[in-house]
């Protein structure tokens, strides 16, 4: 999903968020 880094941190476990150039984030755990 598309989100800000703050939203991504809230959605993912600590240290798991990856954000690409288009600011789409995934939880990499």
UniProtKB/Swiss-Prot annotation:
Post-translational modification: Contains 4 disulfide bonds.
Tissue specificity remark: Expressed by the venom duct.
Keywords of the record: Disulfide bond, Secreted, Toxin
Location of this chain's protein in the cell: Secreted
GO MF entries: toxin activity
Origin superkingdom: Eukaryota
GO cellular component: extracellular region
Domain notes: The cysteine framework is XIII (C-C-C-CC-C-C-C).
Protein's name in the database: Augerpeptide hheTx3
Organism the protein comes from: Hastula hectica (Sea snail)
Lineage: Eukaryota, Metazoa, Spiralia, Lophotrochozoa, Mollusca
């Amino acid at each position: 999903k598309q989100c800000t880094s703050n939203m991504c941190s809230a959605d993912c476990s600590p240290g798991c968020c990856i954000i690409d150039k288009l600011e789409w984030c995934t939880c990499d755990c």
